[in-house]
């Protein structure tokens, strides 16, 4: 089958790869000059199935108020006259219950675990490298209250068979030796030994090369203006390089997917939540992180990527605003400088932001739509890198009329149509 994948980020390129592996004729369209130049460009670098959790959870509304008042708080809301923002926020608040959290978590963890295993199989089959490390993730608690509050998370990890370790100060230092110089800054941690890290952009670029070797065509510098319908199917695309037609289409446009769906009189609850990162060259490897450290207080991820440190965090709800705010940079610099002083050449750091495509309940949207030849692979939020390979394999199976290896029925658009 001829399939056109809309979007050349990590979700679009992994989708193209697994569709090509399944024998389809695939073309990828993207407005940029190459793959992974938007949201996949400089994310935090984590592949963390154990942290696959909805943002909407019990207690979040009260925590959000506290975060908004913090100097280096992890949440920023810049109100705008945007009905889609407010509709999305209301839907998210409705999911902030214990019952909904459990349901949504149960849909996310199996996909994230499957995706990590699928990535491992891909790595073994192709030899692809991307500054990857398989040394786990350490969630670092600065206060005893944070450490004592891990009970609920641990129960969920137990339920899904996710390996974990509760660590005291010495245990944290054993996992991340550089923390030995700042042991007064934290009381303990929660380590997920099977989590991984890696450079998402590097991975996507190399996978795109593997796609080309499998016959996938990439049409860059191609802006999609409209997706044109004919009754209950997509007829063709209006683009900056003329009309494009295919037998089937995959919407993998991240935060921009919702706008294209609205123009077809269809709605999906995907809204952008901006995240920031800095990439810091390592100047002293002895005091740099080994893998990923999650600073629980500031919700910042500090990740070793080769000879660089990637520091990512912040949830900024401000629509499609891509302006870089220096206050967010200071938060990231504060976290990494506090826990790993002297590790990086901070003056040489690069500052970046991207728009995470979030659903109000947490799980992504994968599968069929009301239009017979249009499929979705979007809405992964902060977990696009974690879930990319698994999501792509699931969708490739669906489009090839195969039963996916995991139950993906609850990831379909139908959950919002009930």
UniProtKB/Swiss-Prot annotation:
Q: May I have one GO cellular component term?
A: plasma membrane
| GO terms, molecular function | D-amino-acid dehydrogenase activity
State the superkingdom: Bacteria
Entry binding sites for FAD:
3-17
Q: Example GO biological process term? A: D-alanine catabolic process
Q: Which reaction does it catalyse?
A: a D-alpha-amino acid + A + H2O = a 2-oxocarboxylate + AH2 + NH4(+)
Q: What does this protein do?
A: Oxidative deamination of D-amino acids.
HAMAP family, A to Z: DadA (MF_01202)
Q: Belongs to which family? A: Belongs to the DadA oxidoreductase family.
NCBIfam families (UniProt xref)? PRK00711.1 (NF001933)
- Name of the protein this chain belongs to: D-amino acid dehydrogenase 1
